[in-house]
Each structure stands twice: as structure tokens, then as C-alpha cells.
């Protein structure tokens, strides 16, 4: 059974990528027999190069993606060096799951409603400046992409913090800090000169994922990014949506260019990391041993901004009349909720079906692969984890869409479900990898020595211990599925609509109230499942059940016996 699950995982995650790669390469060379293009050429590449603003879009993409990643990594390190192994770190860990639960699109809509020229932030400033008209400066769709950079950095910092948990525990940071402080280094100097050179290489894969996402993001860039020019990923997406199907080679060339761009930037980052850590090492030994780095209150800011979006979305969804610079709507109404209620039910049902199916299948695959690793000592190839997280979604899905067009029949629903499984699986696997590695195998070995079968030992001993992690990983898979925009749009071909696809399309419209309604519902669903997973994991904790079954004692003194129970 484990072998079958392992093979199925490799098949589902790798096999469809072959026709996808072939589809995008053939399209880029203008070979699309379905459209009557039977002579390969490079017209698509020439059309892409000749498009006005394509070079500026590439430059903007590199600037926003790289800057957002560097900002997120810097904030993550500053938070770690100030909060790790302190009383405040427990609060940081507790808030990570709710922060990760909020989808990027819902956060982007709330960010836009807060930092727009007539948003809540500028309304608050107007109370003191008495400005009667909205401000001209804004962080939403600004020409330099600063709003997009800030939003991406805020959203990706919790992910890097979560990935740092297992890394720092493996590094035994407490021992490193104790040894460094015995040599005269204070806390900040020890973190910068001793911990950082070891932490950064171990965080390479999560940083790659954040960097690739920042370079290729479409949905958040459509809401918060500049439009003249837009980022290159948004430009390729616009080319793909061109009603003239003969322009598909241009979009395919853009998808390949986006892939090459991501690969090039990741390679440059790897080179710079190598030089900083392994070649240019003077900064690790020279300089002052006592200095202080900021970061004490950074996590509060990272946590407050996303949760500030919830009341912003809530108020906007009920606002009927809200003139600038009023801090509160003059009239409230449920009109927009009533207007969209029927659509919301249908879209929420579609999102739930896709999320439940993809998260459950991804969870089964992840558990199967981890058990296969424990039993046969053969890990899942890193390529299976890396492809969905590091390669731009446009570059993968475009070719698969072309391949689907060449198949007889309707394959939109299975293809969409497959795409959701593909992109949810790495996050579910990574969420379970740490608990599986930390599980003490001697527990199941003891159960086997007492006569239980391997299956019964797993269900009765191991499952109760790892069940909280399984529930949280399942919630992570649901959250990832709820956030998928491009897989649903590309492979669903407009036949499958979800809360995310509708929220993105409405966010570019003029009615902020309807956008707030969809953004609020999209943020609410993952929070519900994360809350359910947290509550269920507490009840499923075996320590809780053991404590509940233990006999009650009247006083704490009964736990300490001064005399033996037998009579002398």
C-alpha cells in the first residue's frame, strides 16, 4: 500500500508536467496545429520583444520580487534574534497559523481598502490635517510597486518564521548563543555573526519559494501592483487572455521568459549567498562584539496589519454611503450581502469542494510518502517539492492548458483538481515532515513487541500522537487550495469559479463594497478550518486524554509519598 501511494504521488506530481513542458515549448515556436499554425517559427518571441513596455515590466518584476524577498528575510531574522527563546516567542508561534490562514487575495483587497487615497488610513490622517479631498499619493498601484513590495513582505514573513522553527531547533541555537556569549558577544552580535551564517543556508529552499512567488505572482500584483507598466507576470497573463488565439505564441514566449527570469534570479541569489557565507567571511570575525539590532516590536506590526484587514473589509461590506474624509460610513446597509448571497453560496461550495478534495488527497499522499520513508529509508525526491513552489505557475500551467486543448472530451474539472493537489501537496508535506522526524520510533516498536501488528500499532500508538499535526497540515492544504487563482482560471477555462477568482476579478472593478464582501468571505473560510484544526488537535492530544483518565486527587500532597504503600 505504501509503495502504491509513493508511486501515485510521483505520478500525480511529475507525469502531467511532461506534456505541460512540451505544450509551452511548442506554443512558443508557433506550432499549434489546432489553430492552423503548422510551421514552427519565432514570431511569438519577436512579438514579445516588440511589445511596448515589456523591458520595463521585466525590470519592475525583478525590483519588486527581489526587494520584497530581502525585506521579508530581514524582518524574519530581526524577529528571530529578538524573540527566540524568550517569553514572547510562545505568542509568536501561536499567531503564525492564523496569519498564514489569511489568503493573499483577501489580504490584498483589505490592504487596498486601507492604503488607497480614500482608504481608512488617509481618512484617519485627514482628521488632523483637515484635508477635504483624497490624497494623490497612494501605496495601491503606485508606479514603483512599493505597495506590492510591502504587502508581499508582510504576507511572506510568517511563512519564513514557520520554516525557521525546525531549522533553529536542528541548529541547537541555545548552545550556540551560550558559547558565543561566553566569548564576549552579546545577543545581537551572536545572532549576526554565529547564527546567521548557519541559518541562511538552511533556509535556502523557503527563501527560494518566497523569491519565486514574488517574481511570478499574478493575483496580488493585479490588485496592488502598478498597471503602466504592470509586472511581467501580469503582462503575460493579459497576453494569454487576448481574444485573438493566434497571439498564444507570444504568451508562451512570455511564460518561458518568466521561467528563465526566475531561474536566473535564484541562481544569482545562490551565488551571493555563497560569497557572503563562504568567501567573504571577515564580517563574521571582525567588528564590535556588542551592538543591538532592532526587532522587538516587528512581529506586532506584522501581526496587526493582516488582522486590521478584517474590520476594514467588514465595515466596507456594509457601507452604503461613505464620503471622504469621514472616518465612519454615514449610512450602512446589507444590500450588497443580499445582492451577492446566491453567488456567494455557489462560489463557496465550489471552493469547499475543490479544497476538501485536494487537501485530503494531498494529505493522504504526504502521510504515505513519510511512512514510506520511515519504513524503506527512501525520501521523496526534492524535485517533487521544488517544482510547484519554485517554478512560476504560468510557466507550468500554460503548457498543460495547451495539452488539454489537444485532448478529446472535457478535462477541465479533473485538471483543476490535479493542479490544486499539485500546489497543496508541498505545503502539506513540509508541515508534516517535522512531526514525523521528531516521532520516537521506539513507541511503535514497543507496541510491536507486545504482539500488535504494524497497522494496529500505527493506528493505536502513532496516529494519536501525530494527529494534531495531521489536522493542522490538512488545514494548511485547504488554505493553499482556497488561494489558488491561476490554476482555477487556466485549467478551469472559465467553467469553474471560486471565491478567489471572483474576488480578483471584482477587485479591479469600481465597487469596493462588493470586493469587501468577497474578500471577507475568502478570509473567513480558511480561518474557520484553522480554528477547527486547532480545537480538534487539542482534544486529540493524547496527553489530554491521559490526564483526563487519571484518577483525581484531592491535594497536590498526595503525589508525594513519604511512606511506602505496604505495611512494614
List the model feature ranges, each with a label.
Residues 2-33, 49-169, 198, 202-219, ...:
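Membrane-water interface segments at the C-terminal ends of transmembrane alpha-helices
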Residues 34, 38, 219-246, 325-330, ...:
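Glycine-rich helix-loop "coupling/hinge" segments at transmembrane-helix boundaries
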Residues 40-50, 332-341:
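A short amphipathic helical element positioned immediately N-terminal to and/or at the very start
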Residues 42, 55, 92-95, 176, ...:
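Amphipathic alpha-helical segments in well-structured domains
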Residues 86, 169-173, 178-199, 439, ...:
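Short helix-to-coil transition segments within interhelical loops
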Residues 171-174, 270-279, 439-442, 534-547:
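Membrane-interface capping segments at transmembrane-helix boundaries
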Residues 181, 281-284, 448-450, 544-559:
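Short, highly charged, low-complexity non-transmembrane loops/tails of multi-pass membrane proteins
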Residues 272-301:
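Flexible interhelical linker loops that connect adjacent transmembrane helices
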Amino acid at each position: 500500500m505504501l509503495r502504491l501511494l509513493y508511486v501515485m504521488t510521483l505520478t500525480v506530481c511529475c507525469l502531467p508536467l511532461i506534456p505541460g513542458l512540451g505544450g509551452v515549448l511548442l506554443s512558443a515556436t508557433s506550432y499549434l496545429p489546432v489553430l492552423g499554425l503548422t510551421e514552427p517559427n519565432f514570431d511569438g518571441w519577436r512579438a514579445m520583444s516588440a511589445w511596448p513596455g515589456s523591458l520595463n515590466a521585466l525590470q519592475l518584476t525583478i525590483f519588486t520580487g527581489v526587494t520584497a524577498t530581502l525585506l521579508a528575510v530581514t524582518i524574519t531574522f530581526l524577529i528571530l534574534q529578538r524573540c527566540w527563546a524568550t517569553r514572547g516567542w510562545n505568542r509568536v508561534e501561536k499567531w503564525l497559523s492564523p496569519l498564514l490562514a489569511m489568503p493573499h487575495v483577501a489580504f490584498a483587497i483589505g490592504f487596498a481598502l486601507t492604503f488607497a487615497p480614500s482608504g481608512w488610513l488617509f481618512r484617519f490622517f485627514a482628521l488632523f490635517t483637515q484635508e477635504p479631498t483624497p490624497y494623490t499619493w497612494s501605496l495601491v498601484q503606485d508606479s514603483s510597486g512599493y505597495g506590492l513590495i510591502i504587502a508581499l513582505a508582510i504576507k511572506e514573513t510568517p511563512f519564513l518564521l514557520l520554516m525557521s522553527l525546525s531549522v533553529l531547533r536542528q541548529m541547537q541555537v541555545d548552545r550556540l548563543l551560550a558559547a558565543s556569549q561566553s566569548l564576549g558577544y552579546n545577543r545581537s552580535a551572536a545572532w549576526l555573526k554565529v547564527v546567521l551564517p548557519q541559518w541562511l543556508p538552511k533556509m535556502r529552499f523557503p527563501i527560494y519559494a518566497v523569491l519565486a512567488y514574488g517574481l511570478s505572482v499574478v493575483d496580488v500584483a493585479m490588485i496592488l501592483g502598478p498597471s503602466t507598466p504592470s509586472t511581467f507576470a501580469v503582462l503575460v497573463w493579459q497576453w494569454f487572455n487576448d481574444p485573438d488565439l493566434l497571439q498564444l505564441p507570444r504568451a508562451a514566449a512570455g511564460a518561458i521568459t518568466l521561467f528563465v527570469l526566475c531561474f536566473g534570479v535564484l541562481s544569482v541569489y545562490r551565488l551571493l549567498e555563497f560569497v557572503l557565507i563562504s568567501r567573504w567571511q571577515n564580517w563574521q570575525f571582525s567588528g564590535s562584539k556588542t551592538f543591538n539590532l532592532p526587532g522587538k516590536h516587528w512581529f506586532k506590526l506584522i501581526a496587526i496589519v493582516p488582522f486590521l484587514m478584517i474590520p476594514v473589509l467588514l465595515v466596507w461590506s456594509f457601507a452604503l454611503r461613505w464620503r471622504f474624509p469621514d472616518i465612519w460610513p454615514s449610512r450602512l446597509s446589507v444590500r450588497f450581502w443580499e445582492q451577492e448571497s446566491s453567488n456567494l453560496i455557489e462560489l463557496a461550495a465550489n471552493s469547499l469542494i475543490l479544497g476538501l478534495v485536494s487537501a485530503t488527497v494531498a494529505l493522504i499522499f504526504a502521510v504515505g510518502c513519510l511512512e514510506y520513508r520511515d519504513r524503506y529509508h527512501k525520501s521523496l525526491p526534492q524535485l517533487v517539492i521544488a517544482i510547484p513552489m519554485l517554478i512560476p505557475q504560468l510557466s507550468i500551467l500554460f503548457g498543460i492548458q495547451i495539452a488539454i486543448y489537444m485532448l478529446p472530451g472535457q478535462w477541465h474539472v479533473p485538471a483543476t483538481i490535479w493542479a490544486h493537489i499539485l500546489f497543496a501537496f508541498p505545503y502539506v508535506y513540509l508541515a508534516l515532515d517535522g512531526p514525523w522526524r521528531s516521532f520516537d520510533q521506539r513507541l511503535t516498536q514497543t507496541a510491536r513487541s507486545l504482539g500488535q501488528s504494524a497497522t494496529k500499532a500505527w493506528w493505536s500508538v502513532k496516529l494519536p500522537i501525530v494527529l494534531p499535526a495531521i489536522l493542522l497540515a490538512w488545514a494548511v492544504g485547504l488554505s493553499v487550495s482556497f488561494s489558488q487563482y491561476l490554476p482555477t482560471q487556466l485549467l478551469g477555462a472559465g467553467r469553474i469559479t471560486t471565491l478567489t477568482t471572483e474576488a480578483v476579478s471584482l477587485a479591479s472593478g469600481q465597487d469596493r463594497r462588493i470586493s469587501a464582501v468577497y474578500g471577507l468571505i475568502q478570509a473567513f473560510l480558511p480561518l474557520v478550518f484553522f480554528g477547527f484544526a486547532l480545537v480538534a488537535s487539542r482534544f486529540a492530544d493524547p496527553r489530554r486524554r491521559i490526564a483526563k483518565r487519571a484518577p483525581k486527587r484531592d491535594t497536590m500532597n498526595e503525589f508525594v509519598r513519604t511512606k511506602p504503600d505496604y505495611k512494614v
